[in-house]
Amino acid sequence: MTLHKDRRIGRLSVLLLLHETEENQQISRLERDGWKVCLGRVGSMDAHKVVAAIETASKKSGVIQSEGYRESHALYHATMEALHGVTRGEMLLGSLLRTVGLKFAVLRGNPYESEAEGDWIAVSLYGTIGAPIKGLEHETFGVGINHI
């Protein structure tokens, strides 16, 4: 089980997320290379709304299937891992009087040299977290990777 140097799923999802220009070209290139891609934005004081927004966007864009449990479950774990980075391990937002404004990227595909390894999913989050008062937030980042 060797990672393919040019198919590191976490790295690719982070680069897609942070790339501020030529977004459509980058998505087209990833899709040509066999990746399924989703980008979006979410802001909330509730972590469950962040999770729901990522899941809904991933289903609408075809990154995961709407029916069945396995793909949603893998996405959930990757999203929770990314949220741990954003919230520094404290998965609470509104109850701690903090809010997030995030851009997200979801990438699905096989990062390994062997096709037998199957698909993996990566969720990258970047944006701000802080008190629900404009100007009192700071940057935050998180990434999560899980097998499907």
Curated annotation (Swiss-Prot):
Key words, A-Z: Activator, Histidine metabolism, RNA-binding, Transcription, Transcription regulation
InterPro entries: Regulatory_HutP, Regulatory_HutP_bacillales, Regulatory_HutP_sf
Record-given protein name: Hut operon positive regulatory protein
GO molecular function: mRNA binding
HAMAP family: HutP
Superkingdom, natural source: Bacteria
GO biological process: L-histidine metabolic process; positive regulation of gene expression
Similarity annotation: Belongs to the HutP family.
Alphabetical list of CDD domains matching this protein: HutP
Record function comment: Antiterminator that binds to cis-acting regulatory sequences on the mRNA in the presence of histidine, thereby suppressing transcription termination and activating the hut operon for histidine utilization.
Subunit structure: Homohexamer.
